[in-house]
Structure formats: structure tokens, C-alpha cells
Amino acid sequence: MAGVTHADRCPGVLRPHLAQDGAVVRIRFPGGQTTGAALSLLSGIAQQFGSGDLQLTSRAGVQLRGLPDPVPAALIAAVREAGFLPSETHERVRNIIASPLSGISGGLVDVRPLVADLDAGLCAEPRLASLPTRFLFVVDDGCGDVSGRSFDLGYRAVDHDHGWLLLGAADLGISVPASHAADMLLALAREFLVASRRSGDVWHVGELRSWSKRVPGVRTLNLPLERTDVPLGAVGGAASVQVPLGSLTPAQAATIDATAAGRVVITPSRGLVLPGAAGRLPELVAAGFVDDASSPWSAISACVGAPSCQKSLIDTRAYAMRLAESGHALPRTHISGCERRCGAPAGAHHDLVVPTGSPLLLVGESR
């Protein structure tokens, strides 16, 4: 059985995090690529051992909450046997997000093969197990959706055969052949580890701006950036839906398994894309998914809140429910139970924060 460590709170399966509501494990799906059957299997594990719901993350992964501490060996075995733990040494550094609609709609190239190569190379390099667990790779198919987020290293396609390697932001990059992109991203990750140790074990490439500017071939860029939200509804024959507050219930997981034609993409905005399932949108909406960008649920997110988190002073999800049921049009809004603002969305949004020193005060901030 695996116990909880407090040295690093970014959880994995073998390194859970202990929250107020029990242990939390996180499963990475590089590029958000999974299947309806996989989500159904994880839902069954969550029902057997934890709270029952699956929590989608802003890095296109899945968390199981409310688990016993230590986490049962049977849970770990089930996750391993399902293929969700391909590298026990690297599980917490397999943080790769990609353009969710790549190969479905828009974009210049299908980047899924690059994501697979990057993940395989990452897991094959022993030194890269030492990357900070918050270190993030992004792979953009050229539409500018994920390269506008906060990240550490990235690739953005220019055409089918070329792209930019991005260092810490979309304004610094190196022109590379697409066929070399995975190897060069991994080489830069190794160089970052060396540079970060010399600088006092920093966590992110953005903290080493002077190092980034000295990388051979680096240039200042002015790339156009798009919204980070994935369009909802029928998109390129796919069904694109938002999962309210990122919580996938057992019934919803069963609906996804029944309606998905195989592949499912978890989006960084805590939604799901089901290729080839545009005709099944009525069933998905009936199950509680959102396919309309004018719905309040498409604009509201929240941290897990009380009582699940001891730092939170309010039940953020209950507050989000009241906001959504008000029927008012809302700007992109994130509700946080403390100043840490866990789970805040990428891009411009308003924060509603309960400062820890003033439990009755709700503060709105434009971010």
C-alpha cells in the first residue's frame, strides 16, 4: 500500500495527497487522450474506494478523491492493470496538454503522434523523473489554443513539417523540424534541470528567463494566440461538452461510455470531446453535460472547497450552484475558498476569493 507524502502535494497514484476528505490520487492522460471505457473503469474504481465522482483537472487528467489512507493495494493494482500507470518512476511528471481538437477540427497538423513520442521519451529518460511535478509541456497544433496558457516547454506547429519550440512563454522560440520536436523538447528539459539546480532549484522555465534567452537559436516571437476555451456543441462531427465543475458522476461516466465511439479527449477546461458523436448531443445534455456556451456552467469553475479542503472557508461548489441557478449571464468566474486559487482557469477571468483572514468577505478580482 502507498502512504501519503507531504514533501510535494502534486499527487500521483503511488504518491497520493492527503486532503480533508481523504487521500487524492491523480492519473495523467498526456494530451487528454483516453476512451469512454477507460473513464467508466476509473468511475468504478472511484465508486469502490472513494467518493464515486471523477474530478477532471486543468491539465486534462483525472483525480479520485475521498480514498482511504493508505491507498489500498487493490486500487493501485487496478490502475496498473488498466494501463494507466505506464511508468511508476515518472508518473507525476507526465504533464502534457495538447490542442484538444487536433485531428478533429482546425489546426495545421494532428499533434497526437508528437504527444505520444514526447510521453514515451520522457518516461524513458531516468533523469527527467526529477522534473518538478508542476512542470508542464504543451503541444499546439497551430491554432494557438494551448500555447497561450502558462507552461514550461512547448511546441507550436507552423505547418505539417515545422514548428516553434517555445521556452516558458509564446514569445521565445526556436524553429525546428517537426520530426525533431520531441527529442529537442526532452533535451531542453534536461538542460532546464541543470540550470534550475544552479539557480536554487526553481520550479519553472519562466523563472529562468535569462537562461531561456541564451539557448542557441532562440528568437523573440509574436505569435497570434486564441481563446483557450474549446467550442461547445457539434464541432467537426464531434460532441464537445462541458462537465459542470469538472465533476463526472458515475451516471455521466456511464453515458460517456455508451455514447463515445472509442476515443475521448479530456480538455484543459474540464470538458470532454467525443469524436464522431455530434449526433448524440441530446443524450449528453440529458445526462447533465453542457453544450451551450451561453450556459452559466460554461463560465463558472471552483476549487474543491469545504468540506473537502481544510484551507477553504466556504463550500465553493454550493456557491457556484447558486450562481449558476441565478440565470444571469456571467463573465468567466472562478470561485476559491482561499488565496491559493487552486484550479483557476487559463486566460482572463474573474476570481471570487474568500481571504483566509475574513471568512465573510468575498472579493472579486479581474485576472
Region spans (language model):
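Intrinsic, low-complexity N-terminal interaction/targeting segments
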Residues: G3-L18, D291
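An acidic, glycine-/histidine-flanked metal-binding catalytic module
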Residues: R156-D229, A254
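Small-residue-enriched alpha-helical segments and adjacent helix-cap loops
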Residues: A2-G3, G22-L165, D171, V176-S179, ...
